[in-house]
Amino acid sequence: MLQLTPQSRIFLATHPVDFRKGIDGLAAVCRQVVQDNPLEGAVYVFRNRAGTALKLLVYDGQGYGLCLKRLSQGRFTWWPTTANARVPLSARELMILLWNGDPERAQMAQDWRRVA
């Protein structure tokens, strides 16, 4: 289970990654590309090359957790364009991003299909 609080440290990896990578592969990306230690408890957000899915990697002191969000339709509308390997996010910005919104404008995308 992933618990996000306003105090959570969340980092967005700005370059897309191969989503065949699992926990160990994404932890290696944290160390080599993002140049961070994934064992320090931060949440790392990765995007696939197509821009249709996100993976969240977190270490909670007992083990890794990996979450996947794949859109049913379309692509994520917001992604930072920067030379930095990582961008910090707040928990609120991450929730907006997961709902395919734009954290910079705080607008939510329309639901593709209502959940009953």
Language model segments and positions:
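Polybasic/polar functional segments that serve as interface/processing modules
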Residues: M1-A116
